[in-house]
C-alpha cells in the first residue's frame, strides 16, 4: 500500500461486540494483493505486524441477511459461503446444513462455560 492506500478511510465498528478499528479499504480486491479476490465485501486494514505491503487483515463485513457490520470473531459471526451475524444464524438455524448447526451448538455450549 502506498501512503494514500494506508490512510484510514473510516472506522469499522462491529455492531455486536463494538470492536472499533480504522480500516483502509472496503471491497473484495485488497490493494497490492493482485491475485486475491475475497468472497465478500470486507473491511480491511494493512497488517501492522509486517512490513510486507501485500499482507492485510480482514476486520469484518456486513451480515448477508441483516446487513449489520460484524467482525470476524467467532462470538459475532460465522462464514458459510457468506458472512452471517450470530443472531441471524440462530434465528435461521434450521436453514443451515447440519454441520453448521453443530458448530453453532458448540459455540453456544462454550459461551455458557
Curated annotation (Swiss-Prot):
Protein name: Cysteine-rich DPF motif domain-containing protein 1
Pfam families: C6_DPF
Superkingdom of origin: Eukaryota
Family assignment from sequence similarity: Belongs to the CDPF1 family.
PANTHER family: CYSTEINE-RICH DPF MOTIF DOMAIN-CONTAINING PROTEIN 1, CYSTEINE-RICH PDF MOTIF DOMAIN-CONTAINING PROTEIN 1
Amino acid at each position: 500500500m502506498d501512503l494514500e492506500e494506508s490512510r484510514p478511510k473510516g472506522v469499522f465498528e462491529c455492531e455486536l461486540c463494538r470492536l472499533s478499528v480504522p480500516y483502509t479499504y472496503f471491497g473484495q480486491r485488497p490493494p497490492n494483493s493482485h491475485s486475491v479476490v475475497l468472497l465478500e465485501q470486507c473491511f480491511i486494514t494493512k497488517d501492522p505486524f509486517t512490513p510486507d505491503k501485500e499482507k492485510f487483515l480482514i476486520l469484518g463485513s456486513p451480515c448477508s441477511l441483516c446487513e449489520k457490520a460484524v467482525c470476524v470473531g467467532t462470538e459475532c459471526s460465522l462464514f458459510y459461503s457468506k458472512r452471517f451475524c450470530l443472531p441471524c444464524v440462530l434465528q435461521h438455524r434450521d436453514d443451515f446444513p447440519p454441520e453448521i448447526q453443530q458448530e453453532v451448538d458448540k459455540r453456544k455450549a462454550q459461551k455458557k462455560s
